[in-house]
Design a protein with these regions (language model features):
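Intein modules and their embedded homing endonuclease domains
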Residues: 1-119
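P-loop NTPase catalytic core of nucleic-acid-dependent motor ATPases
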Residues: 31-54, 98-175
């Protein structure tokens, strides 16, 4: 991740070496901050953004632990409150300017490959397929007359196309 570097420091009294994260003030592509608070982190393994601060902690701690093993040092993990690293991280976040993009502006289907620039934080549990929607046809043709059905399908199409943020209209279904 690009918002910290791994560093070592040695305790002069005991001679023990510790591994820790040095949070860098940079325009990060992996971390989003909104309103002086953590907003999202890029989870490379899943190809999605995550708004879970505990996942961020796990990703950073895994990196620190791996580096500590390589350098034969003691890891100072975010998970442990005694190390003070979580407090340092929270202070770091509060000092950063806003750096965020709205997440999930477009639908992401199950097998769709995502990139960081797609700003997706969740996937639908199914894929979009080109199959005849027999049940949908039966239900919608029973409930709506052709003009109202066309309006509804236009709205659904705008959601699927990702145009809803550009269109200032909405539809309410009730009954």
């Amino acid at each position: 991740m690009d918002f910290y570097r791994l560093a070592n420091k040695t305790n002069l009294k005991t001679g023990e070496t510790y591994c820790y994260t040095d949070f860098e003030v940079v325009r990060s592509k992996d971390l989003m901050v909104r309103g002086k608070s953590f907003y999202a982190v890029w989870d490379h393994a899943h190809g999605l953004w995550s708004q879970d601060a505990y996942l961020l902690r796990q990703l950073v701690d895994d990196d620190v632990s791996r580096y500590a093993t390589e350098t034969d040092s003691h890891p100072l993990l975010l998970r442990s409150s005694d190390t003070g690293r979580w407090d340092k991280f929270q202070q770091y976040i509060r000092n950063l300017p806003d750096n965020s993009v709205e997440l999930d502006c477009q639908l992401t289907f199950n097998s769709q490959v995502t990139r960081r620039e797609d700003y997706a934080s969740k996937r639908l549990s199914y894929d979009l397929r080109d199959d005849p929607p027999e049940s949908y046809e039966s239900l919608v043709s029973t409930l709506y007359d052709p003009r109202e059905r066309a309006k509804l399908e236009w709205a659904i199409g705008s959601v699927l196309a990702g145009d809803t943020r550009l269109i200032q209209k909405f539809i309410v279904l009730y009954g």
